[in-house]
């Protein structure tokens, strides 16, 4: 999977519906703190009006192929959600070799380990610092991206996930048969 070229303009993207859960207010504050960086929200939603920083583009709803292409052009994937389950867009970004920067909530923390395969942030300053490092794309950031990509292949591929589900169902069936 090719990553965005390192000489491409520094772009940060997120993907999904613009709702309270996805924390567009924080996304906007982060963008406002980094006016030299372009931010793209791929999607739409009832809180679109909160994305007021001049360096934010909201695509509206686009076809899946276009959403993937837009994400591929970005260097960084940002997920500042207030809560998550297992965020599929995060897994996809890891597969696309994006530097991932996420909020410190269950779901995100289940997948991203701070400064191992991305950044887990709690404060505006932490997000800004992580994005600045991603813009520079130092050796650590490249290592996090590679670690995240290898983890996707080893932990979240279809075969691996089917095997994990099979184990869960087998344990449940065995427990039922014992009772």
Where are these regions (language model features)?
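Short alpha-helical donor nucleotide-sugar binding micro-motif in glycosyltransferases
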Residues: 61-62, 69-74
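Conserved donor-binding/catalytic core segment of Leloir-type glycosyltransferases
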Residues: 4-22, 28-32, 39
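Nucleotide-activated donor-binding/catalytic signature segment of Leloir-type glycosyltransferases, i.e.
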Residues: 49-65
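Short acidic/histidine- and often glycine-rich active-site loop of Leloir-type glycosyltransferases
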Residues: 50, 91, 105-115, 119-121
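Conserved acidic donor-binding segment of nucleotide-sugar-dependent glycosyltransferases
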Residues: 114-125, 133-139
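A short, well-ordered alpha-helix in the C-terminal region of glycosyltransferases
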Residues: 140-155, 164-167
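Aromatic "clamp/platform" in nucleotide-sugar-dependent glycosyltransferases that forms part
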Residues: 82
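Short hydrophobic beta-strand element within catalytic cores of glycosyltransferases
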Residues: 99-102
């Amino acid at each position: 999977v090719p990553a965005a070229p390192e000489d491409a303009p520094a772009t940060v993207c997120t993907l999904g519906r613009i709702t309270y859960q996805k924390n567009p207010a924080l996304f906007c504050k982060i963008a406002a703190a980094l006016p030299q960086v372009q931010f793209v929200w791929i999607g739409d939603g009832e809180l679109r009006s909160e994305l007021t920083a001049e360096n934010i583009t909201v695509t509206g709803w686009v076809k899946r192929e276009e959403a993937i292409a837009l994400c591929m052009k970005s260097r960084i994937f940002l997920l500042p959600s207030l809560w998550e389950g297992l965020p599929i867009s995060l897994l996809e970004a890891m597969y696309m070799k994006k530097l991932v920067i996420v909020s410190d909530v269950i779901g995100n923390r289940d997948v991203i380990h701070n400064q191992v395969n991305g950044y887990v942030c709690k404060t505006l300053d932490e997000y800004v610092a992580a994005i600045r490092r991603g813009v520079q794309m130092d050796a650590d950031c490249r290592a996090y991206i590679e670690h995240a990509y290898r983890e996707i292949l080893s932990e979240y591929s279809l075969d691996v996930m089917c095997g994990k589900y099979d184990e869960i169902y087998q344990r449940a069936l065995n427990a039922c048969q014992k009772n």
